[in-house]
Regions:
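Flexible loop/turn connectors
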Residues: 246-348
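Short, solvent-exposed amphipathic alpha-helices that sit
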Residues: 40, 86-101, 175, 198-222, ...
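An alpha-beta-alpha
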Residues: 174-218, 331-348
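Hydrophobic alpha-helical segments within soluble ligand-binding/sensing domains
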Residues: 164-191, 238-246, 309-327
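Short beta-strand elements in bilobed, periplasmic/extracellular small-molecule ligand-binding domains
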Residues: 99-110, 208-240
Length: 348
């Protein structure tokens, strides 16, 4: 039945001069199809005698809200609104812009306890979900698996289902290493206070591999962040920072090029290093950090070179990926999309 439906849609698409996905949108009364295009598709359907089946692939009109628009939810697991990071705000902006562009109904839901099964998720008639944060508990997982899903960013633990849009972690680490190497640094160090965060580990792996391939030396100054019940976004302890700084100070010869895993960490590491007499700046110890989260950089002098992960672009692209998934529910394989970062060099 699915094969017949797909073949019929393909014939309609060919006659109308559009893509199969456009035919699917017209069938589902999707609001983002141009009126002229929709009319061409309907004429082609009439000419071919094609009547859509309720069993065809793709999102069904019965899943639409009463207004006829697609309803998606942005679900943030393991935290509350008041603990968000600047990068997350960029993510929200991207999601909101894309949802508005496609005339989607967008529902935000923060779920502090990922083991909780919120009534809002149960009651809302959702066409798809965007997910960020901690992995859900068993009951919530079973509910979310029934809905087309896209994860945003590189979560602490890699999700086992759903598509994903995230920064290109290999490119992040490579950019950091190549920048420091280009500045003449031959002994490098990667600072990370969260070794259980798989995306940050990926940054470190790529950074070290790039340095080694260039004949440089890379030291790993890492600590495991203790997890608590305070949520997905947790602050790093000063005790861990000072312990890591002591490790760095004991290295001989000491690395002069440092890559810090994220801006929340560099806001703690750079002042801690300077308090110990480490001179930071051009021709001295130079630092690269990641995320380009301006609020964390206020008060740092000099400002570190930044790697911008394009959080807003990730948000927009996640909505586009969810649209694709809604239109291709029969595709079993997961799609993981990475967004290219770029470097913002320090003026120092």
């Amino acid at each position: 039945m699915y094969l017949c439906s797909i073949m019929s849609i393909t014939r309609v698409a060919k006659l109308a001069g559009v893509s199969s996905s456009t035919v699917s949108r017209v069938i589902n009364n999707h609001p983002r199809v141009a009126p002229d295009t929709a009319e061409s598709v309907r004429k082609a359907m009439q000419k071919l005698g094609y009547t859509p089946s309720d069993r065809r692939p793709g999102p069904k009109p019965s899943l639409r809200s009463r207004t006829g628009a697609t309803t998606i939810a942005f679900v943030v697991l393991g935290t509350t609104r008041n603990r968000s990071t600047p990068a997350f705000e960029g993510l929200v902006a991207g999601v909101s812009q894309a949802a508005r562009q496609h005339n989607f109904n967008l529902v935000f839901s923060h779920i502090p306890d990922p083991e909780e099964l919120p009534s809002r998720i149960l009651s809302d008639r959702l066409d798809g979900v965007l997910l960020h944060g901690a992995l859900p508990g068993k009951e919530l997982l079973e509910r979310l698996r029934k809905v087309p899903a896209v994860w945003l960013m590189g979560n602490r633990r890699r999700p086992e289902w759903g598509d994903q849009v995230m920064p290109d972690g290999y490119e992040v680490g490579e950019l950091a290493a190549k920048h420091l190497l280009s500045r003449g640094h031959r002994r490098l160090a990667f600072f990370n206070l969260d070794t259980k965060h798989w995306a940050l580990r990926l940054y470190g792996h790529a950074f070290a591999a790039t340095a080694t391939d260039a004949g440089a030396v890379c030291e790993m100054v890492e600590r495991e962040k203790p997890l608590s019940s305070s949520g997905y976004w947790q602050e790093y302890s000063m005790e861990l920072v000072e312990d890591a700084v002591r490790q760095y100070l004991a290295l001989s010869p000491r690395p002069s090029g440092i890559f810090v895993a994220d801006d929340m960490q560099v806001a703690m590491f750079q002042p801690a290093l300077q308090r110990q007499g480490v001179v930071i700046g051009t021709g001295k110890v130079e630092i690269v950090s990641c995320n380009n989260e301006t609020p964390y950089l206020i008060g740092l002098h000099p400002t570190p070179t930044e790697i911008d992960i394009r959080a807003e672009s990730i948000g927009r692209r996640a909505v586009e990926q969810l649209i694709w998934r809604l239109e291709h529910p029969q595709i079993a394989e997961r799609i993981v999309t990475t967004i290219e970062p770029f470097i913002i060099k320090s003026d120092a």
